[in-house]
Amino acid sequence: MEVKKTMEKIVALAKNRGFIYPGSEIYGGLANSWDYGPLGVELKNNIKKAWWKKFVQENPYNVGVDCAILMNPQVWVASGHVGGFSDPLIDCKECKTRHRADKMIEEWNLKNNENVKVDGWSNEMLMNYIREKGVTCPECGGKNFTDIRKFNLMFKTFQGVTEDSKSEIYLRPETAQGIFVNFKNVQRTTRKKIPFGIGQIGKSFRNEITPGNFIFRTREFEQMELEFFCEPGTDLEWFEYWKNFCFNWLLSLNIKKENLRMRDHSKEELSHYSNATTDIEYLFPFGWGELWGIADRTDFDLRQHAEHSKEDLSYFDPNTNRKYIPYCIEPSLGADRVALVFLCDAYDEEEVEEGDIRVVLRFHPAIAPVKIAVLPLSKKLGDEAYKIYEMLIKKYNCEYDETGSIGKRYRRQDEIGTPYCVTFDFDSLNDRCVTVRDRDSMQQVRIKIDELLSYFEGKFDF
């Protein structure tokens, strides 16, 4: 049967099964704020572990850091965020709504079959396009707009007891700058030679004007970023390497290839510091959206911080006896956005019998929130079944469930993506075997209790 995936179905399942809840819900919520429930936090943690394993732990080039969210404000002056990290805002004079001009144009283009990309356009270019094409307000259809103005996306706060300009500080809008300012520290203490990379997972904050589509774009989000430093002249070679590495990481975790594509940025779209940028995009239920940005940032960041801090951030290459400021390749992935990708991609509906639809999340076993569910056929068998649960939980994240019919319990586990169910029945009392059910095939096999641990060995590897 053809499965129609919708955001409504994904969001409903996520809320009802304990993946993601609306933030501050008992107080009426907070716009674009989401809390991860018991299953959601396990899913996201497993995704982060899978990223860290392949990008840092198992990669001989790379090491990790965990930098502070609050940094010296001069960091953001040097990086260009204070002066240039902003969105183009425009107001509709008729209905008094505020919009991001570039996103408003993109939405209008989509509805009117205009295949024009406006990334990187100046305010003047955006305004001219709105007037020439007759772009309308998405809320009321009006054409009477204010001029476009810039809105800085950084959250500003104050450090200490006084609230004045001297105590102004920002919540970081990206994790990357913490890596750049620690480049020399990491290189010196690890004695790494170029090429090498520094990975980090952490929270970032952006005061987005048009957040939305569930956890696709939020104001508080978690990033998984790698800054890979290389010799100038080798950057495009490494750029291609990391593009393919990132794409293959997604495929290795069972993301369907037909739902992925790479889109190279045009010259007009490129950031002023970028030599090349490619987005890995995913086909969400609401259409294609950016998932993973891979950018050749050249030596912009290290050079900026060297200039503003007056510190020497160059590298002496012992192989060539040459001193240079390394170029940097940055694969930047949002943990929340890729969690949404795994939810969307894993979601499936299957007609088991006529009119009987089974909803299943076909997660790769490595990222499944619950690995094994232990289910006694009857509550009378609970004591013996619970011993199996206690044995397995020392090694795997498991659930124990004795409530409801065995069929309903299987369906509950299918809906949360549990790869295996272990059923202890009345025969188990005598033959000391249990039934192991596979989520995807629904095939069942009898396994001796003493051999359960060896049976599951390697089934959740990545």
UniProtKB/Swiss-Prot annotation:
Protein family membership: Belongs to the class-II aminoacyl-tRNA synthetase family.
Any one Gene Ontology BP term: glycyl-tRNA aminoacylation
Enzyme Commission number: 6.1.1.14
Binding site for substrate: 100, 174, 221-225, 330-334
Function recorded in the entry: Catalyzes the attachment of glycine to tRNA(Gly).
Gene Ontology CC, one term: cytoplasm
Gene Ontology molecular function: ATP binding; catalytic activity, acting on a protein; glycine-tRNA ligase activity; protein dimerization activity; transferase activity
Keyword Plastid belongs to the record: no
List of residues binding ATP: 206-208, 216-221, 290-291, 334-337
Reaction equations catalysed: tRNA(Gly) + glycine + ATP = glycyl-tRNA(Gly) + AMP + diphosphate
Protein name per the record: Glycine--tRNA ligase
UniProt keyword list: Aminoacyl-tRNA synthetase, ATP-binding, Cytoplasm, Ligase, Nucleotide-binding, Protein biosynthesis
InterPro entries: aa-tRNA-synt_IIb, aa-tRNA-synth_II, aa-tRNA-synth_II/BPL/LPL, Anticodon-bd, Anticodon-bd_dom_sf, Gly-tRNA_synthase/POLG2, Gly_tRNA_ligase_bac, GlyRS-like_core
Record keyword Protein biosynthesis present: yes
Subunit note: Homodimer.
Subcellular location(s) per record: Cytoplasm
